[in-house]
Amino acid sequence: MELIRTEIPYCEPSHEALSSFSESTDAIVPDAFPDMGRIICAAGAATVKDELPQTDRILVSGMVNAVVLYQPEGESGVRKLSVPLSFAHIEEARGVTAESVCFVRCRVGGVTAKAVNSRKVSVTAQLCVETDVYERRTVELTEQIDPQADALEILSGQETIPLLEDAAVREFTLLDDLEIPGGERLEIVTASCELGLAGCQAMNGRAALKGDARLTLLALDDTGAFQVLHQTIPYTQIVECEDVQEGRTLAARLAVRHLDCMFAEGGVLSVGVGVGVLLLREGRHTLQTIRDLYHVHRTLELEERQLALRGCHLCGPFTGESTAVMPVSRPASEIISADAVCAGLQQSDDRTIRVSAQLSVLYRDADGVICSASRQLPVNVPIPASEASACVQDAALQVSATPGGEGNLNLRLTVSGQLTERPVLTLRDITALSVGAPRKPCGGVDTTLILRYIHAPEPLWEIAKQYASTVQAIRRANALAEHTESVSDAMLLIPVYNR
């Protein structure tokens, strides 16, 4: 008997993690700047330079462009101090090699600044890194057996699973100039960007991406007042995607790798967004499986294993809302800006995800003094029952804050992300097969036909296997329809062939 084995090439998600870490540095106030009096707030944006897969780990490195706003000693104005801060993070991931496909999303969860003295400041940036790793694999599976005789009975089946055919990382840059009324009077404090994807279409050897980049800028005008600006940049980009054919199912995930914003002459806002793209070529594979087998005359000696295939399917966008209360040291009278970053994500049950939200709020107190507050809060977000089997990736938070009572801020958070299903299909894989000793006679040495009453529903396959018969023989002997799979409350004639 010959095993007919089939090779199945596919791409498997092997590691996913959302982790947080911090990096610190000290900075000296430049000679041209006045002494620090009171630190108002600190913020920053991350630039990812490298995401290198190595043996059993991924090295993520880059730079945080941190900004410290302070009130000079003896003055009422606001000064901005830029502090570059490099970072390197090692994500442990067993099984990763240099050939692994890695996709990284890195965000600044928050920046804190503490004055060492009037000319020196210590800055700490909290970073949140989402890491996903995909491995290209090939497995062998016995889908058929050449019996080389009529005495081998095989019960075959089919299983369909969404397997990734390939994963690849690409990059592109969005460039645009935006007319901002009064922009010549503004100085950017910090900027952030959320990427939206409206469509991903497979072309021959390429992928067409369409969506928008949503910018949020915190700026100071020439009077020292804060302004929050929101701008949207639509985009259509073509990126290389080898071996993909037009019409195939293609999905994409996006990450901001760097963001550059500056006001040019005439108040024009020049924007450059570096975008990382994870392209996932999806496919639905139909596999023929061997559910059971037996030999009519002899026992079978076989070796088998349980083969687990992990699929991946991007189901679509997810949006959920929740509320929270954030305590602050000085009661707020006016909110200037509020920002939130996902620092952790856990599906607590079938209907709820638990989000660790890193919150930063800039506000004025009752005396008009500008204050800042940052805190990490757990937030429970409901999941619709229809989406309970999927996990949430690429989580982005939007937050609005209003002054509350008893020194609190009332927060409303919107969580958006990508729903992903990762089903695991376990298959029976026969790796070796041979015939053994003759089967024991059923009902006696000379028995060729057994009459049995079947009470409860019982599959014909199990009856045939037990009595060394075949399903087709039982159907013919009892004039059963070709599609009959089981019988109940019936007298059954069972031909016996094990002699």
Map each language-model feature to its residues.
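Membrane-lipid interaction segments
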Residues: 1-444
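Primarily a LysM-type cell-wall glycan-binding module
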Residues: 437-476, 481-499
